[in-house]
A protein has these predicted regions:
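Extracellular/periplasmic Venus flytrap/periplasmic-binding protein
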Residues: 97, 142-143, 150-252, 288-292
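Extracytoplasmic "Venus flytrap"
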Residues: 32-66, 84-93, 115-116, 182-190, ...
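Bacterial signal peptide processing site
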Residues: 24-27
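C-terminal motif of bacterial Sec signal peptides marking the signal peptidase cleavage site
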Residues: 19-22
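Segments of small-molecule ligand-sensing domains
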Residues: 304-310, 321-371
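Extracellular/periplasmic periplasmic-binding protein-like sensory domains
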Residues: 245-314, 324, 368, 372-374
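Periplasmic-binding protein-like
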Residues: 46, 102-115, 135-137, 178-183, ...
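Beta-alpha junction/loop-to-helix N-cap segments that form part of ligand/metal-binding clefts
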Residues: 30-32, 59-61, 71-149, 212-217, ...
């Protein structure tokens, strides 16, 4: 099977359920990505957290990218690619230093990531200046595509898409009348919370800001319980969200609790405890993993279950790898490939409009029985 044909087949089959075994071989026929035409040592990079408080989200994405890489290498044995991981720990300053290393390594022709909005903003100028294409699975700050960068792309909807849907769910499904909105002061958390505030209008009964790595939320808990709120929205990440809901429930709060994709992780339940976490609503522009993808993911990642943005990690990597399969070996050629990408992915149809993906779906996941249950689209 010719390599070009193989990658087109992979993309179609992935969207249908990741039944990829039929595409696991290539012939020795000459193609754009075979033999001496393929440079040796081609690499893609992953940039995102692998350690630290928010490592789970980064690991989910890099593991998803591993599945795409495995599929690619099985189908393209004549032009194998490796992925080098760069651990930002979710820190924009660390990500900036790592971006310099990535740019200086000329064997790296594309980047899966950055994973977080803050580090995406911090590294955008550098990657754009180097002409090195990046495809993020999870950076949702709407402002990231307003800087004129031609290299930044994402395969997920933005907070500008998610926040109105979150507000709609709070009003129409939770039927809340008084909502207390809290954010973690991060670029991501405040941006999402501000969008929810706007969508809720006069239903907002109170606001507060906390900090990342904060563990004592007693002052905020007092404000919430004193406000008479029947719902709380939190913009931030799972470590603090779990502690916040735990302390709210301990103080007698009986209302609903909602947070966004930064909290959609088993770490939320671990921090909160199952009893406190049960009933929480966690929204995300990320699709639930299919059974077929879950099987492949576990096989490629030592039995680990796919998590938030794992499937999007697959899609982000596959956007880049499919270009390599078509003989796009230089940074310039891959950038052009991604800018004009228009194919079905695992999670959605992927086509970019100035870096933003065209297809937008927001899912609501509910915690029940001490687990995050499969999400359903917010209508």
């Amino acid at each position: 099977m010719h390599t070009k044909h193989t990658l087109r087949t992979l993309a179609v089959v992935a969207a249908a359920g990741l039944a990829l075994t039929a595409c696991g071989t290539t012939s020795s026929s000459s193609t754009a990505s075979s033999g001496s035409n393929c440079p040796s040592g081609l690499k893609i990079a992953f940039l995102g957290a692998q350690t630290g408080d928010y490592a789970n989200l980064g690991i989910n994405i890099s593991n998803g990218a591993n599945v795409a890489l495995d599929d690619y290498n099985k189908a393209n044995s004549d032009c194998k690619v490796t992925m080098q991981k760069f651990d930002s720990q979710g820190d924009p300053n660390q990500a900036t230093k790592l971006a310099t290393q990535i740019i200086q390594d000329k064997s790296i022709v594309g980047v899966v990531g950055p994973a977080f909005s803050g580090e995406s903003g911090a590294t955008g100028d550098a990657f754009n200046g180097a002409g090195l294409v990046t495809v993020s699975a999870s950076a949702t700050d709407p402002a990231l595509t307003t800087h004129g960068w031609t290299t930044f792309h994402r395969v997920v909807a933005t907070d500008a898409d998610q926040a109105p849907q979150d507000a709609k769910y709070i009003k129409d499904t939770l039927n809340a009348k008084k909502v207390f909105v809290i954010d973690d002061s991060s670029e991501y958390g405040k941006g999402l919370a501000d969008g929810v505030r706007k969508g809720l209008g006069n239903l907002v009964t109170g606001n507060d800001a906390v900090q990342q790595k904060q563990t004592d939320f007693s002052a905020t808990v007092t404000k919430v319980t004193s406000s008479g709120a029947d719902a709380v929205f939190y913009g931030g990440y799972y470590a603090e969200a779990g502690l916040l809901i735990k302390q709210l429930k301990a103080a007698g709060y009986k209302g609903a609790f909602m947070s966004g994709d930064g909290s959609l992780d088993p770490g939320f339940i671990q921090a909160a405890g199952a009893d406190a976490a049960n009933g929480a609503i966690l929204t995300c522009p990320c699709a639930p993993s299919s059974a077929d993808f879950t099987t492949k993911y576990k096989a490629d990642n030592s039995g680990a279950e796919p998590g938030t943005y794992s499937a999007e990690g697959y899609d982000a990597a596959n956007v880049i790898l499919s270009g390599i399969a078509e003989g796009k070996y230089t940074r310039a050629d891959l950038l052009d490939w991604v800018n004009n990408y228009d194919q079905d992915g695992l999670t959605k149809h992927i086509k970019f409009n100035k870096g933003d993906v065209s297809t937008v779906v927001i899912y609501a996941y509910k915690v029940g029985g001490g687990k995050i249950q499969p999400g359903t689209p917010i209508k």
